[in-house]
Amino acid sequence: MQKTILRKRDLYLNRIIAFQDTEMIKVMTGIRRCGKSSLMKLMAEHLRDTGVTDDQIIEMNFESMGIPDMDARGFYEYVKARICLNKRTYLFFDEVQKVHGWENAVNSFRVDFDCDIYITGSNAYLLSSELSTYLAGRYVEIKVLPLSFREFLDFHGYILTERKSPAGGFRKRITDAEGETYDVKELFDAYARFGGMPMLADVGLEIDRVTAALDGVYSAVVINDILEREKRKGQRNITDPVLLKKIILFLADNIGNNTSATSIGNTLVNEGLLKNGTRKTKPAVQTIQAYIEALTEAYIFYEIKRFDIKGKEYLRTLGKYYIVDIGLRNYLLGYRDGDSGHILENIIYFELLRRGYDVAIGKIDNQEVNFIATKADEKKYVQVTESMNAPETRERELAPLRKIRDSYEKIVIALECDLTQTQDGIKIIRALDFLLE
């Protein structure tokens, strides 16, 4: 069997290292197969490179058959027997939520031993009220996402260089290891088609291999992180796998569209999408909401709420959902052409999240700003569009930004536009330049 290559992801690794040797428990969350386990290995490798010895590192992957089934007490005793005396021990627990009562054991490690703790989980249930009760104020969450476009190029063996352009700014050049030059847009199209799941760098970008790999991700998320998790919780909110699949397909097909549980139920009935299942009537709004929450807790979909820019408050209705990896969307719906505007919007949304922004939809009067991105004292208003070449498109994208009276940055990110320019104080930049910053 070919050994998986451990590739650097400095964006996340540096965030983890920043909390090394603090009492904060480092919690890495994100959809299954997005690279959390590799980050744990990279962190352990970093420790060894900086003088930490092997006996100071305990690594446990609870999805491995090599780790025996255990409850919280067995977990505690297993680790206690391996703690390094008179030196700090570094504890790495992968998919720790598989241990019933794990939070009791982890809290005891923190109290009883000189240790530095790192854990991962593929479901937001990991950070539920139970964890908050035991570890309130003592953990930091590192939210891990699939590869950015820049990481995608790196993982697939492409080299990005920049040189000054005679027309101003910088021109980006992408080559492979042999020096052959590739078109940036062509590679972006591959990213927008196949997505950024890290394992694709090992299996390649042939359509059959990609489909098989993404099928494995999807099945693992639905079975392990939704259906099985419901059993572990002792709750049975998610009882209809057919309905779950229909809701997944609806959300995937409607990324970037205003969505509610009511509208989903109506669409399922009106378009006859329930005919192949056992359910004969429209599911209750609460049922659909429970299914959506399960999908967001498994990190396959992310909800984004609307913010009234003038009223300065969040609105309760008509939020949107984006899918964590555009390759998963194409796997679910078929590798079809079209809808590139929403695909670009989806990609930009997750790029803003990667860069540490909190993101909302902006509402101003009866118009919409795609994203309000905030981070500490920084704020920017972002419009996303395929092209800024047509006058009517330019006016549509600029109009809501012109209405905003504060002095925060306002930008339009377009797949097709001239060199970076400014109009009415609004910066217009090319999407590929933004993604490769």
Located regions from the model:
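Interdomain hinge/linker elements that couple catalytic modules in large macromolecular machines
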Residues: 6, 159-344, 350, 358
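Short regulatory helix/loop adjacent to the ATP-binding pocket of P-loop NTPases
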Residues: 125-141, 153-158
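Short glycine-rich substrate-engagement loop in P-loop NTPases that contacts/grips substrate
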Residues: 58-87
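A cross-kingdom feature that marks ATP-driven nucleic-acid transaction machinery
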Residues: 2-5, 23, 29, 38, ...
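Conserved P-loop NTPase "ATPase switch" module shared by AAA+ and STAND
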Residues: 84-102
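Pre-Walker A adenine-sensing motif
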Residues: 3-21
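Structural recognition of the conserved hydrophobic beta-strand(s) that form the central parallel beta-sheet
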Residues: 116-122, 143
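Conserved glycine(s) of the Walker
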Residues: 35
